[in-house]
């Protein structure tokens, strides 16, 4: 069955208004997409994190006429529509198309991230099985890749690892598969903790090796290795707390940082850590160091 697809160029402030309007006129789905390959910056509390220039993508059942639909939207919102485009698209197996787009990826010398439905390219390598879900972290983003490559290059034997802002659990699970004794994960999002637990089970990691907590429930820990792939603002504001979670001589890896934010984040940790040169990839950076 064909579908009518309508794409609208909006600002974050317009998102809720147009989402409600599209659903009211019969959209079967409404999705927000990055219009210009931009990073998501830290949102205000209790708001949807969106890009400065966002595309709203709405799908309608085949046979829906675009012109009266768009006119109805203008009546509902009380203003002319922003820049928009409509087209009829053919149906496809969306799940299969998505699965085909997620292929095994290698990080460093030992580590592979492998979709759970895909055969491991190197069965004797360290293979982390993963299903992308609601939480961030599949290895495709430069910040995740930078952290995975760093973990692959570390000797993690007998180490306790803390993954602060664990998302899908990919970093903590990678650390465990690479030899860590235990990994603790924490995230503000309950769905992220559920995704971490599911992905740990997929990799035969026992619950006791990977305890998960909301931040307010996190016990007092001292980690041999702390990884935090979140955002620059929280990394700066949480610097005293995160520094205090790392043992003397322990290691730190931070990402989720735009290149222009790197110096500010590094400065927040410089008094407690001997920092390595900043690693850069595609406009994002990783900051690593050792606790004094």
From Swiss-Prot:
It holds the Pfam family PrmA. SUPFAM superfamilies: S-adenosyl-L-methionine-dependent methyltransferases. GO terms for biological process: methylation. Its EC number is 2.1.1.-. Belongs to the methyltransferase superfamily. PrmA family. InterPro entries: Ribosomal_L11_MeTrfase_PrmA, Ribosomal_PrmA_MeTrfase, SAM-dependent_MTases_sf. The keyword S-adenosyl-L-methionine applies. Keywords: Cytoplasm, Methyltransferase, S-adenosyl-L-methionine, Transferase. Its main location: cytoplasm. One of its GO terms (cellular component) is cytosol. S-adenosyl-L-methionine binds at residues 144, 165, 187, 229. Disulfide bonds: none annotated. It catalyses: L-lysyl-[protein] + 3 S-adenosyl-L-methionine = N(6),N(6),N(6)-trimethyl-L-lysyl-[protein] + 3 S-adenosyl-L-homocysteine + 3 H(+). CDD domains: AdoMet_MTases. Gene3D superfamilies: Vaccinia Virus protein VP39. It is found in: Cytoplasm. The lineage of its organism: Bacteria, Pseudomonadati, Pseudomonadota, Gammaproteobacteria, Pseudomonadales. Methylates ribosomal protein L11. This is Ribosomal protein L11 methyltransferase. GO terms for molecular function: protein-lysine N-methyltransferase activity. It is an enzyme of class 2 (transferase).
